[in-house]
């Protein structure tokens, strides 16, 4: 199949890009671009759709955007899509301390990738979820809230895990596997450019 443009993964986060490329592999025509998208508020799926529409208009072609949430069950899903702001102000220790008053430390990591073929195409959302618990921060502090999230069935936090293990179980992996299957079905795998 010949297509005219590469898929632009709109992100300024080098770690997210690295993980996405490791999970998707090299057979898809993806390049990254930093686009200043507004920080939207609302339901995670609605946020992903709107971000994707804005990115598609900005890029003028196929785009992939990602939005990640960390949801505490005791707090009815908060901080959710606002976790970036909570983390900026509270750091990993503060995220952990948010649950001091609750016995329930369960949480889930949610990743929504949204894809659009261009400005006139309705975005499609691919959700991935991993259940776990919130623990005292452990491991390197170079990737967001990874030090406080311990997936169910594991003794390590995301931050402590080898990347090869994390990249088989993470919320991002689960979402990107759906993206990968969709892109294959649309003929994006191993395509040539016009």
UniProtKB/Swiss-Prot annotation:
Keyword annotations: Cytoplasm, Hydrolase, Magnesium, Manganese, Metal-binding, Nucleotide metabolism, Nucleotide-binding
BP GO annotations: deoxyribonucleoside triphosphate catabolic process; nucleoside triphosphate catabolic process; nucleotide metabolic process
Taxonomic superkingdom: Eukaryota
Record text on cofactor binding: Binds 1 divalent metal cation per subunit; can use either Mg(2+) or Mn(2+).
Major location (coarse): cytoplasm
Catalytic activity: ITP + H2O = IMP + diphosphate + H(+); dITP + H2O = dIMP + diphosphate + H(+); XTP + H2O = XMP + diphosphate + H(+)
GO molecular function terms attached to this record: dITP diphosphatase activity; ITP diphosphatase activity; metal ion binding; nucleoside triphosphate diphosphatase activity; nucleotide binding; XTP diphosphatase activity
GO cellular component: cytoplasm
Entry EC no(s): 3.6.1.66
Stored InterPro entries: ITPase (IPR027502), ITPase-like_fam (IPR029001), RdgB/HAM1 (IPR002637)
Subcellular localization: Cytoplasm
Residues reported in the UniProt entry to bind Mg(2+): 39
Binding site for ITP: 11-16, 51, 67-68, 84, 143-146, 166, 171-172
Disulfide cross-links: none
Pfam families recorded: Ham1p_like
The protein's required cofactors: Mg(2+); Mn(2+)
Enzyme class: hydrolase
Subunit record text: Homodimer.
Family from the record: Belongs to the HAM1 NTPase family.
UniProt function note: Pyrophosphatase that hydrolyzes non-canonical purine nucleotides such as inosine triphosphate (ITP), deoxyinosine triphosphate (dITP) or xanthosine 5'-triphosphate (XTP) to their respective monophosphate derivatives. The enzyme does not distinguish between the deoxy- and ribose forms. Probably excludes non-canonical purines from RNA and DNA precursor pools, thus preventing their incorporation into RNA and DNA and avoiding chromosomal lesions.
Name used for this protein in its record: Inosine triphosphate pyrophosphatase
Organism name: Dictyostelium discoideum
């Amino acid at each position: 199949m010949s297509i005219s443009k590469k898929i632009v993964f709109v992100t300024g986060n080098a770690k997210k890009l690295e993980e996405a490329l490791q999970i998707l592999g090299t057979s898809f025509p993806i390049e990254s671009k930093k686009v200043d998208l507004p920080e939207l508020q609302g339901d995670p799926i609605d946020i992903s759709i709107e971000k994707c529409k804005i990115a598609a208009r900005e890029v003028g072609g196929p785009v992939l955007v990602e939005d990640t949430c960390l949801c505490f069950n005791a707090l009815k899903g908060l901080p959710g899509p606002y976790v970036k702001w909570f983390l900026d102000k509270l750091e990993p220790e503060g995220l952990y301390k948010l649950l001091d008053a609750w016995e329930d430390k369960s949480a889930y990591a949610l990743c929504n990738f949204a894809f659009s073929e261009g400005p006139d195409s309705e975005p499609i959302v691919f959700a991935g979820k991993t259940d776990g618990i919130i623990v005292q921060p452990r491991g390197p502090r170079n990737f967001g809230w990874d030090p406080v999230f311990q997936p169910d069935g594991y003794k390590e936090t995301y931050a402590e895990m080898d990347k090869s293990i994390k990249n088989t179980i993470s919320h991002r992996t689960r979402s990107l596997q759906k993206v990968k299957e969709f892109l294959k079905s649309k003929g994006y795998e191993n395509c040539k450019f016009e």
